[in-house]
């Protein structure tokens, strides 16, 4: 029987208790605390629009503790990388939780071939960027360095479902102090099933043993816990991807109610780059990519920024009424 997400965090607590410790956990916690402290109180009349946590890429489910084999989720990280760029452009500070090896902000337009194809040797064996790539490389470096140098981008990598959910918990609790200034934009493709760490084989599973039968557990639904416990005042956006268009919007609306999201972005695998549907308690809004040269994320982020601003302003209005 599937667990009811509204019954509390018992399954989540068991998941975290059994999970292998996050690598560099103390360093990550310190970086998070510094980043959030730097940007807390910057909203309202300040320059910063808010702080958003963008999750991107797919999680893996290891089948062995010393992992050789794993189950993967489809996601290139394109949406998360593009959205991060547009959030930065809109004046947000961004915590970017991303799958190692996935698309990165400002690198989406670089060639997908070997990294070495971006460079060539000059006459004196100095390294140069070919003219064909020079403009896009310069733009990528300029924009990326600006975000890093101004302290507006914090990147936190993951590979496994264990790493991802531990990072999400750490970021959620760290951003709680931001109140409504915080936003979560949960574009990562998160595994629905996993092998509990204590149930895994320690070493590589032997193929000589014959067919493999494996029991997978459901991953605890952390969206409800994020919304109700870790960062209850934040503006929360989740995504629903389906291959069957007949059930997509129905499932998106169910997720909106079930997990208390502010927005669920529904997208179909066949055309996810071209069109998405924003599902809210007030109805549906279809967002389309204007042309092949544009990103659907640009229009999507513009709408979400406006909604987040209204979310923040609502608190200010409530406070004003009390005073």
UniProtKB/Swiss-Prot annotation:
Statement: the UniProt record of this protein carries the keyword Ligase: yes
The protein's Enzyme Commission number: 6.3.2.5
**Enzyme category, top tier:** ligase
Copy the pathway line from the protein's UniProt record. Cofactor biosynthesis; coenzyme A biosynthesis; CoA from (R)-pantothenate: step 2/5
Task: Give the highest taxon in the source lineage.
Answer: Eukaryota
GO MF assignments? phosphopantothenate--cysteine ligase activity
The chemistry this enzyme catalyses reads:
(R)-4'-phosphopantothenate + L-cysteine + CTP = N-[(R)-4-phosphopantothenoyl]-L-cysteine + CMP + diphosphate + H(+)
> Which UniProt keywords are listed?
Coenzyme A biosynthesis, Ligase
Enumerate the Gene Ontology biological process terms.
coenzyme A biosynthetic process
What is the stated purpose of this protein?
Catalyzes the first step in the biosynthesis of coenzyme A from vitamin B5, where cysteine is conjugated to 4'-phosphopantothenate to form 4-phosphopantothenoylcysteine.
- Fill in the subunit field for this protein: Homodimer.
Record-stated family:
Belongs to the PPC synthetase family.
Stated name of the protein: Phosphopantothenate--cysteine ligase 2
Which organism is this entry from?
Answer: Oryza sativa subsp. japonica
């Amino acid at each position: 029987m599937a667990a009811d997400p509204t019954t509390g965090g018992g399954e989540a607590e068991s998941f975290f208790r059994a999970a292998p410790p996050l690598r560099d956990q103390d360093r990550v916690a310190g970086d998070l605390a510094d980043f959030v402290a730097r940007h807390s109180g910057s909203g309202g009349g300040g320059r910063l629009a808010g702080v958003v946590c963008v999750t991107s890429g797919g999680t893996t489910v290891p089948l062995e503790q010393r992992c050789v084999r794993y189950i993967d989720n489809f996601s290139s990280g394109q949406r998360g990388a593009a959205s991060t760029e547009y959030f930065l452009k809109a004046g947000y500070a961004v915590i970017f939780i991303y799958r190692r090896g996935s698309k990165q902000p400002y690198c989406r337009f670089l060639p997908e071939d070997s990294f070495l194809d971006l460079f060539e040797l000059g006459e004196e064996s100095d390294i140069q960027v070919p003219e064909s790539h020079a403009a896009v490389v310069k733009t990528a470096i300029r924009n990326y360095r600006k975000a890093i140098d101004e302290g507006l981008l914090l990147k936190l990598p993951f590979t496994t479902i264990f790493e991802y959910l531990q990072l999400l918990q750490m970021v959620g609790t760290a951003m709680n102090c931001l109140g409504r200034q915080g936003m979560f934009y949960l574009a990562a493709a998160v595994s629905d099933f996993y092998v509990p760490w204590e149930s895994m084989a320690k070493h590589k599973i032997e193929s000589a043993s014959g067919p493999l039968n494996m029991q997978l557990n459901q991953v605890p639904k952390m969206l409800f816990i994020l919304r109700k416990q870790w960062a209850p005042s934040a503006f929360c956006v989740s995504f629903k991807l389906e291959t069957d268009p007949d059930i997509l919007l129905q499932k998106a609306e169910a997720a909106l109610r079930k997990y208390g999201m502010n927005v669920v972005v529904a997208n179909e695998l066949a055309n996810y780059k071209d069109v998405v549907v924003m599902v809210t308690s007030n109805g549906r809004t279809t967002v389309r990519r204007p042309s092949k040269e544009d990103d659907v994320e640009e229009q999507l982020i513009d709408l979400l920024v406006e909604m987040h601003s209204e979310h923040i302003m609502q608190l200010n209005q409530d406070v004003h009424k009390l005073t």
